[in-house]
């Protein structure tokens, strides 16, 4: 025992002496880390034409070699359904892990933690036991939606973009066929989990107009706005029409046909991920990917249970204390905001948020009606298009021209979420104040971006001077209680394995009595889109928790604008990074 202790002591001393001889040159470490992150940014962009086009007007100025970029819709699933091979991912992650975090600058530590969070989760999800667990055809955000929106909103800046757009359209059929092959293998392995009827209905809505599609019309308009000579314009429009018919529409016909076959003879799991062998483990990783932290399913369940009780209590308290004020909420006769246009809402918000949010020099924006064909079937009020990292910095908002009442509280809330002080403002602040292109383009922490936008939409309610604030507070608490319940149901379906009947019993236990058709619709939406709502409402509760802690610690020294600066200054990041910035703000102002 004594000899063993002596040997271990010697090894420990030797190790310490070796480390002592290998002191890290912090400036060199920082330089190499910047080079690694830049290489990752360039490598990602060069391998993804669509991302390059969306984020950059002049890719060469970012170090992108366009000769290495294939004009296509992206990499296809391999035999195991992976887009990026585990080896490629592991090689980059292994290189990353050689860096010494303590030698980095504070901004680099943020980037380090973002990369670590994303890469470690990706590595776990790429485990071969999860082969064919991921779905390409989720009913809320599957490729059937992504493709139609992508082409309807595609930015054409020059003649080369038109040529590339035609190439992309022609790539739709082969891309979709590769994804359908993957989906067929899912079914063969007993891992299919789709809302088949909703996919078929969406395909029908795309196919029904045929070549009279508003999507094709939108692309034609983009070509016409370049003011090329008439011969070229007509040639490109003819090529677009041919590609749209033979590739885009044909791809949707293939999707529809495959889903119909699954309906007739396929094995399709109509319950949650818990029904699969590794489903609970897979769901927990999906959950962590969607919440911006490594909290467990049980942590989130407890968070949502507590939040649900709090929101329900707050709502009941308001109703009891102010029955007349909240009667419009109970009777579903909410008052109008008085706004007559989306522009009026955004211009007002741009002016009033300056008291509580940090200044941004460029809040220029442009509103366009969303594609009518997509608007008519989506029910979406508005959405924000991510701006390029370079270019004129004008923010783009798409709004629904046909299905929403601009003067409703709901529309105001959505425009605040997508516009000011939500996504549009957050991106404007980030582009102006965060230097790292990696954070701006490749940090995909939806719990931060969506959680912040939900927080922003509820903050904006306080600016509605013409509506009773007591009513608006009850409106907010009622909505948040409902969404907490939906996240609890998502956990119930995918982690606990609830059936439709168990879901119905849960809803009734929370005081929500729905007819069977509504129960089935809500269950199907949650079942086909695991962890889809968590970014919004877990993200919101993470932010509001940080705010309440800061308010409690600082008391009268708490200031909204300084808190919002701390909340925004990291850019898109997991909450451990955001918390560090909030902690620094609190420590500075104690």
Task: Identify the role of each PLM range.
Residues 1-7:
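Positively charged n-region of N-terminal signal peptides that target proteins for export
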Residues 8-9, 422:
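Intrinsically disordered, low-complexity segments enriched in polar/charged small residues
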Residues 17-20:
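C-terminal motif of bacterial Sec signal peptides marking the signal peptidase cleavage site
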């Amino acid at each position: 025992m004594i000899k063993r202790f002596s040997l271990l002591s010697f090894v420990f001393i030797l190790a310490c002496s070796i480390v002592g001889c290998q002191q890290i040159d912090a400036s060199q470490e920082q330089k190499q880390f910047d080079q690694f992150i830049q290489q990752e940014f360039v490598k990602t962009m060069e391998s993804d034409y669509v991302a390059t086009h969306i984020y950059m007007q002049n890719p060469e100025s970012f170090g992108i070699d366009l000769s290495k970029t294939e004009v296509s819709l992206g990499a296809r699933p391999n035999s195991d359904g992976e887009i990026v091979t585990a080896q490629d991912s592991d090689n980059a992650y292994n290189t990353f892990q050689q860096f010494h975090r303590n030698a980095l600058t504070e901004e680099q530590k943020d980037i380090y933690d973002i990369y670590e969070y994303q890469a470690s989760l990706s590595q776990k999800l790429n485990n071969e036991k999860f082969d064919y667990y991921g779905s390409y055809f989720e009913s809320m955000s599957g490729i059937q939606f992504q493709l139609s929106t992508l082409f309807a909103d595609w930015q054409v800046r020059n003649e080369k973009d038109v040529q590339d757009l035609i190439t992309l359209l022609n790539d739709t059929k082969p891309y979709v066929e590769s994804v359908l092959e993957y989906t067929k293998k899912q079914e063969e392995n007993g891992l299919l989990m789709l809302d088949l009827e909703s996919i078929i209905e969406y395909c029908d809505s795309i196919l029904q107009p045929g070549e009279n599609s508003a999507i094709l019309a939108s692309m034609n308009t983009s070509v016409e706005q370049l003011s090329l000579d008439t011969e070229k314009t007509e040639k490109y429009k003819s090529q677009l029409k041919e590609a749209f018919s033979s590739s885009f529409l044909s791809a949707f016909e293939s999707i529809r046909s495959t889903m119909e076959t699954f309906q007739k003879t396929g094995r399709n799991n109509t319950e949650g991920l818990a029904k699969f062998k590794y489903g609970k483990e897979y769901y927990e990783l999906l959950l962590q990917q969607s919440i911006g932290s490594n909290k467990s399913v049980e942590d989130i369940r407890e968070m949502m249970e507590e939040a649900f009780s709090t929101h329900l209590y707050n709502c009941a308290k308001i109703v009891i204390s102010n029955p007349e004020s909240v009667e419009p909420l109970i009777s579903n006769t909410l008052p109008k905001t008085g706004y007559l246009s989306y522009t009026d809402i955004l211009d007002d918000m741009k002016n009033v948020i300056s008291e509580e949010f940090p200044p941004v020099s460029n809040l220029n924006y442009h509103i366009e009606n969303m594609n009518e064909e997509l608007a008519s079937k989506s029910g979406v009020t508005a959405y924000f298009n991510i701006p390029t990292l370079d270019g004129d910095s004008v923010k783009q908002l798409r709004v629904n021209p046909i299905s929403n009442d601009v003067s409703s509280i709901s529309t105001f809330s959505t425009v605040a979420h997508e516009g000011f002080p939500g996504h549009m403002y957050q991106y404007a602040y980030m582009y102006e104040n965060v230097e790292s292109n990696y954070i701006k383009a490749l940090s995909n922490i939806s719990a931060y971006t969506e959680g912040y936008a939900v927080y922003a939409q509820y903050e904006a309610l306080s600016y509605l001077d013409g509506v009773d604030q007591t009513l608006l507070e009850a409106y907010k608490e009622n909505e948040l209680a409902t969404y907490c319940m939906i996240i609890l149901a998502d956990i119930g379906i995918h982690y606990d394995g609830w059936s439709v009947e168990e879901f119905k019993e849960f809803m009734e236990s929370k005081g929500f009595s729905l007819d069977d058709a509504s129960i089935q619709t809500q269950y199907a939406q949650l079942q086909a889109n695991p962890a889809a709502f968590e970014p919004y409402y877990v993200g919101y509760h993470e932010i509001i928790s940080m705010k309440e802690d800061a308010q409690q610690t600082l008391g009268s020294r708490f200031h909204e604008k300084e808190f919002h600066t701390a909340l925004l200054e990291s850019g898109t990041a997991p909450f451990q990074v955001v918390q560090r910035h909030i902690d620094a703000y609190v420590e500075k102002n104690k």
